[in-house]
């Protein structure tokens, strides 16, 4: 975002400034936090800003894709679900992450700015000044990578620090570099968790860019049992699980194509797919006529949301390698989830399609579906032109456009969008 926008949102959303505001009327200058003594606080702020943006990213991505349907009565929310967001829409560009209509561009840009700023400071300090500096640096860099994953996957284009307009692939290339830098720091710190997270993030960035060989190599470095979550807290609106908040306020419901999914058994029967179990509430959404179906994945406001996992890494390997490797991975992941591992095929297309389907189930409401539809050119459901339940027709958007608030305030971006 341009400076004028960032400065305003930084005060509203950024946890560093939130900490400063509670100390009023002392009016402590933000520069006072540029001290090695505050290194851990600064990195924690980086994590907090990411988690704010990540929750909104997952919820909005669910609406933009085919995971969630809007069942509310707030018209400003409908463009997400209808896939016709306009660049002049203020909701997606400047709203906070905890708004009824969650904003994404500003919260994610704020998180990215915080991570980059903190990482830059950590690079100037020494190990003597900051105990565990390499570990803190690794975390800041890895989160900076995931901030760019969100920008690159959800937006058609974006800008970094008042720079030029970047394509999704250019933003994702930056994400890959941040993960590489974070990996080096994590290895220097001898931190196996952050090392695995860096490999996981880089595998995703490489997959997003179409580098299957590189994604495959990185995904193989993610150990069994690995999972890294974004935390949530029901006592804070900013930290409440954003998908749960949508369900709880009766604003969003699971879409029909993800209701009642099953997995085949070896005997020809089926069992419910517990990875994507949904629950009928017996209520309607806020619109008073659409049934409210919620995901059992997020039944409380403090339910964590996975950022990266062994399961995601395995599915990247399956997509990259295909064949019997993919078949084995599909069955192993099903068995690990307590489901039958009965999938068999030697047809490359059938195997690829099953991997895509497994991703939609295993990674349901984790923020991966919208970009999967885009990068794999999957059919949009409902199709463009179909009547939308709140009026109008479904559009063709697979990503959110660069908002006017960025284009009009950034001197390095063409104002015509050409």
Show which residues each predicted segment covers.
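Conserved, well-structured interaction surfaces
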Residues: 40, 46, 77-154, 181-189, ...
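Hydrophobic-face positions in mid-chain alpha helices that act as interaction patches
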Residues: 84, 176, 210-211, 216-311, ...
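Short coil/turn linking the two alpha-helices of tandem helical-hairpin repeats
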Residues: 150-160, 208-212, 325
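Membrane-proximal, proline-rich intrinsically disordered regions
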Residues: 13-65, 381-418
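"A position-specific structural signal for the A-helix of alpha-solenoid helical repeats
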Residues: 136, 143, 150, 194, ...
């Amino acid at each position: 975002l341009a400076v004028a926008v960032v400065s305003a949102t930084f005060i509203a959303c950024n946890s560093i400034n939130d900490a400063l505001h509670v100390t009023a009327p002392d009016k402590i200058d933000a520069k006072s936090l540029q001290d090695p003594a505050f290194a851990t606080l600064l990195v924690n702020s980086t994590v907090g800003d990411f988690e704010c943006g990540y929750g909104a990213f997952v919820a909005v991505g669910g609406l933009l894709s085919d995971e969630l349907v809007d069942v509310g009565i707030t018209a400003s929310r409908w463009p997400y679900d209808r896939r016709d967001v306009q660049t002049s829409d203020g909701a997606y560009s400047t709203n906070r992450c905890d708004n009824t209509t969650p904003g994404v561009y500003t919260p994610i840009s704020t998180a990215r700015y915080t991570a980059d700023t903190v990482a830059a400071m950590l690079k100037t300090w020494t190990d003597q000044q900051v105990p565990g500096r390499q570990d803190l640096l690794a975390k800041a860099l890895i989160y900076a990578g995931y901030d760019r994953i969100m920008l690159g996957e959800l937006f058609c284009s974006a800008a970094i620090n008042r720079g030029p307009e970047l394509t999704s692939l250019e933003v994702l290339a930056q994400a890959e570099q941040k993960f590489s830098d974070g990996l080096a720091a994590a290895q220097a710190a001898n931190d196996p968790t952050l090392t695995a997270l860096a490999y996981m993030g880089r595998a995703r960035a490489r997959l997003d860019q179409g580098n299957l060989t590189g994604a495959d190599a990185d995904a193989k470095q993610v150990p069994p049992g690995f999972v890294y979550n974004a935390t949530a807290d029901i006592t804070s609106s900013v930290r409440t699980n954003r998908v749960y908040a949508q369900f709880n306020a009766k604003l969003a419901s699971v879409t029909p194509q993800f209701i009642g999914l099953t997995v085949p058994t070896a005997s020809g029967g089926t069992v419910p797919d517990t990875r994507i179990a949904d629950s009928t509430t017996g209520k309607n959404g806020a619109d008073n006529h659409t049934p409210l179906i919620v995901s059992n994945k997020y039944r409380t406001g403090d339910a964590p949301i996975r950022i990266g996992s062994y399961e995601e890494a395995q599915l990247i390997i399956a997509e990259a390698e295909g064949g019997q490797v993919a078949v084995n991975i599909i069955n192993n992941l099903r068995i690990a989830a307590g489901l039958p591992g009965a999938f068999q095929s030697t047809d490359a297309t059938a195997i690829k399609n099953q991997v895509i389907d497994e991703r939609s189930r295993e990674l349901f409401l984790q923020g991966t579906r919208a970009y999967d539809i885009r990068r794999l050119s999957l059919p949009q459901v409902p199709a463009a032109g179909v009547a939308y339940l709140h009026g109008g027709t479904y559009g063709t958007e697979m990503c959110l456009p660069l908002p006017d608030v960025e284009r009009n305030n950034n001197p390095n971006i063409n104002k015509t969008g050409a």
